[in-house]
Amino acid sequence: MLNKGLAEEELFSFLSKKREEDLCHSHILSSMCTVPHPIAVKAHLMFMETNLGDPGLFPGTASLERLLIERLGDLFHHREAGGYATSGGTESNIQALRIAKAQKKVDKPNVVIPETSHFSFKKACDILGIQMKTVPADRSMRTDISEVSDAIDKNTIALVGIAGSTEYGMVDDIGALATIAEEEDLYLHVDAAFGGLVIPFLPNPPAFDFALPGVSSIAVDPHKMGMSTLPAGALLVREPQMLGLLNIDTPYLTVKQEYTLAGTRPGASVAGALAVLDYMGRDGMEAVVAGCMKNTSRLIRGMETLGFPRAVTPDVNVATFITNHPAPKNWVVSQTRRGHMRIICMPHVTADMIEQFLIDIGE
């Protein structure tokens, strides 16, 4: 640590230089995060010092968290859902498996997880001492439902389905998984961290949420397609009392028990997430998603015209291509585990950006 503090001008000159080293969103095509909506930023700044980990000190902020869960529950066809604001999909997925493990006590628990699942499930299983039983994807890069039942045994505590996979933008057949979960009396967690704020706004959305009786919990990240400030995730559970399985005593706080994973939790990003949803409304979110899907379709058509075939036809705004072609200079794309080029058409990705990318990769 410095013995003598820096002058403000010197300090912010240093910080500005470091910020300039960061990449600009105008050329980022690989990220599932986006430029926050100005409304989210404004709301975030209003609640910068609030801590949801001690809600008795910040009752107004805590009420915003309840409203956020209510809004998301309504969107997912179950207004009475329980839940809380998390740091993002990783925390939500860990907590969902904690609930599943607490509900079904077995000596050697396992969970049946898609090949296409996010790497956070590996973290969750490592932390919780749960075996991962991975089910392969079919040709469309959705979970091969025919393999799921065979993977279940007496020690299986949960199934996982993906609604908007990180790498390919596919939505598993959650209806089929929900049926299996009901038949086998298993917990079903749906990771909709990305797709949760895309799918409900599509013209013909596939079923993935609490409208399916077998769905137990859903992860969704407002800091992705919800255009909130970071970090803003949410875990929703079908019955609020399910969260009680996670309770621990907190004798010196303004609440005597808590079920969250983190203690200190930012109220600012919750305010930002709720503000965007209420400001945009369903009509506004439908317009944003329609724009992202239009750009995705244009990108796919343009890439195929250039000789780069799609790997799959995505359900949400993630495009993948069968090519080893490097990204054009100054553009950032990513690669799937199967070696396909991966591009996400987030709200910050404009039609002009897509056209310029196609020009650059075609040269």
From Swiss-Prot:
Cofactor names: pyridoxal 5'-phosphate
EC category: lyase
Keyword annotations: Decarboxylase, Lyase, Pyridoxal phosphate
A molecular function GO annotation: aspartate 1-decarboxylase activity
This enzyme's EC code(s): 4.1.1.11, 4.1.1.25
Modified residues (N6-(pyridoxal phosphate)lysine): K224
Catalytic reaction annotation: L-tyrosine + H(+) = tyramine + CO2; L-aspartate + H(+) = beta-alanine + CO2
Biological process annotations from GO: carboxylic acid metabolic process; coenzyme A biosynthetic process; methanofuran biosynthetic process
SUPFAM superfamilies reported for this sequence: PLP-dependent transferases
Keyword Lyase: yes
Pathway: Cofactor biosynthesis; methanofuran biosynthesis; Cofactor biosynthesis; coenzyme A biosynthesis
Family affiliation: Belongs to the group II decarboxylase family. MfnA subfamily.
Function: Catalyzes the decarboxylation of L-tyrosine to produce tyramine for methanofuran biosynthesis. Can also catalyze the decarboxylation of L-aspartate to produce beta-alanine for coenzyme A (CoA) biosynthesis.
Protein name: Probable L-tyrosine/L-aspartate decarboxylase
Species of origin: Methanosphaerula palustris (strain ATCC BAA-1556 / DSM 19958 / E1-9c)
Lineage of the species this protein comes from: Archaea, Methanobacteriati, Methanobacteriota, Stenosarchaea group, Methanomicrobia
Designated gene of the protein: mfnA
